[in-house]
UniProtKB/Swiss-Prot annotation:
Catalyzes the formation of 4-diphosphocytidyl-2-C-methyl-D-erythritol from CTP and 2-C-methyl-D-erythritol 4-phosphate (MEP). Pfam families: IspD (PF01128). Optimum pH is 8.3. This is 2-C-methyl-D-erythritol 4-phosphate cytidylyltransferase. Its cofactor is Mg(2+); Mn(2+); Co(2+). The record marks 157, 213 as: Positions MEP for the nucleophilic attack. One of its GO terms (molecular function) is magnesium ion binding. Keywords: Cobalt, Isoprene biosynthesis, Magnesium, Manganese, Nucleotidyltransferase, Transferase. There are no coordination bonds that occur between IspD and magnesium in any of the complexes examined to date. NCBIfam families: ispD (TIGR00453). It comes from Escherichia coli (strain K12).
Amino acid sequence: MATTHLDVCAVVPAAGFGRRMQTECPKQYLSIGNQTILEHSVHALLAHPRVKRVVIAISPGDSRFAQLPLANHPQITVVDGGDERADSVLAGLKAAGDAQWVLVHDAARPCLHQDDLARLLALSETSRTGGILAAPVRDTMKRAEPGKNAIAHTVDRNGLWHALTPQFFPRELLHDCLTRALNEGATITDEASALEYCGFHPQLVEGRADNIKVTRPEDLALAEFYLTRTIHQENT
């Protein structure tokens, strides 16, 4: 079936290991309830009617993905990821077909809310560069002295945001910016940073702070709490 300008492809880079989780199992394959974190993250994307396909970039040596129901899902495409996140995203973009817009979502960010996703997707009607979900910084921020666990100074938090995912951009623009940034040796920490490097200014779409990324062991219980609460709210 041919895509329309409203159809969106999502790319999920899932080739990382996540050593801060202190576990032999890659964090995206840890379970919350009866599903892995990766499954929760992908199903949140597919729950929106505009998301027609999800491309998941996994490690070439990954033997776990094939055991998941996702492996046989008709809307899922699997590609080999790279050593770095940007390499995996580029591999996903190449498999995104003719989708005009793409979402990029962390494999270990399972608590995405549908209202946040809908507001992010609405950027395709008003923006040529796209944007990201983000949360305003609420805590006092401190800059450490170089090489020391000592405060150098307090950072003004006004105008500071925590970057979240999904991040949402025109497919060709993201591909070109990632390619240029990598070729020129730029440091790419997320997809938006590639656009910033090329002179673009993506929009900030305020999202819920409970859209957490599971990075450390204590995050797993917190994500389970948020997911359980969300499911309860949707069923009442």
